[in-house]
């Protein structure tokens, strides 16, 4: 593990990532956080199960199901691998959602910004940034999740006025949360992702961050390889769990 990997506990880092990626609706259940954002991303439409829900796990999961039904989303629990609640959630009849569109399992990777910072990204709210990171029709949920949460940066690289690479950064406490890194197919294999990450890291350092955090699906091998080359290592993993079909 890298030197910075245990500066943050798993629960604390999960909390920071959640604050950097705020859902439209967030309702506490003890230490847990039930989240909904009209289906935009698994993170913003699942219940973060770190800490004590304050009631027995089976009862807490019933509350989660009710919350999900009330917001028109599939009941989903965001569960850290190897956490204290994982076995109890399984015993309650829930199972890993192997068909989750974003992937059932994700890595949380961290690394020191100073290792790859180069330049400083400009924070520009460009239409092309939204198109590349969220699509041609941007929903209210997308604008809320991407546009809020800590100190946010819409970083991009352009070519003849066209946004060809984009990434979103959000600083919460001393962590720069990185998400939605995208490069147009016509401009890939030119080092743009690495360049943009370096500039975003420089911006993060200016905001007082020292560490980056990335949540990446385990099947996204190109992204994992890039982040490893930048000096990031795996901190922990989480999976999405759903109730058994009755």
Regions found by a protein language model. Name each.
Residues 117-182:
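Flexible, substrate/cofactor-facing loop regions flanked by secondary structure
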Residues 1-71, 86:
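N-terminal charged segments
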Residues 48-54, 181-188, 217:
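A short, internal acetyl-CoA/4′-phosphopantetheine-binding micro-motif in the GNAT/acyltransferase core
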Residues 57-65, 183-185, 189-202, 206, ...:
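Conserved acetyl-CoA-binding loop-helix of GNAT-fold acetyltransferases
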Residues 40-46, 103-105, 171-179, 188:
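A conserved beta-turn-beta hairpin within the catalytic core of GNAT-like acetyltransferases
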């Amino acid at each position: 593990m890298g030197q910075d990997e245990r500066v943050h506990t798993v629960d604390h880092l999960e909390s920071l990532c959640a604050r950097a990626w705020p859902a439209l609706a967030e309702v506490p259940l003890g230490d847990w956080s039930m989240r909904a954002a009209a289906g935009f991303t698994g993170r913003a439409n699942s219940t973060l199960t770190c800490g004590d829900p304050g009631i027995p796990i089976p009862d807490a999961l019933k509350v989660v199901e009710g919350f999900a039904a009330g917001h028109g989303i599939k009941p989903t629990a965001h569960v850290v691998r190897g956490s204290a609640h994982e076995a109890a959630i399984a015993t309650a009849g829930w199972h890993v959602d192997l068909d989750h569109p974003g992937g059932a399992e994700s890595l949380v990777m961290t690394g020191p910004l100073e290792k790859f910072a180069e330049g400083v990204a400009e924070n520009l709210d460009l239409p092309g940034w939204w198109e590349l990171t969220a699509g041609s029709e941007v929903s209210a949920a997308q604008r809320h999740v991407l546009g809020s949460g800590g100190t946010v940066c819409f970083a991009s690289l352009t070519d003849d006025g066209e946004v060809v690479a984009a990434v979103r950064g959000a600083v919460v406490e001393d962590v720069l949360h990185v998400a939605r890194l995208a490069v147009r197919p016509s401009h890939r294999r030119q080092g743009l992702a690495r360049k943009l990450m370096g500039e975003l890291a420089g911006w993060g350092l200016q905001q007082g961050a020292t560490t980056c955090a990335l949540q990446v699906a385990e099947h996204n091998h190109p992204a994992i390889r890039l982040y490893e080359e930048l000096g990031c290592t795996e901190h922990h993993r989480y999976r999405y769990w759903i109730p058994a079909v009755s």
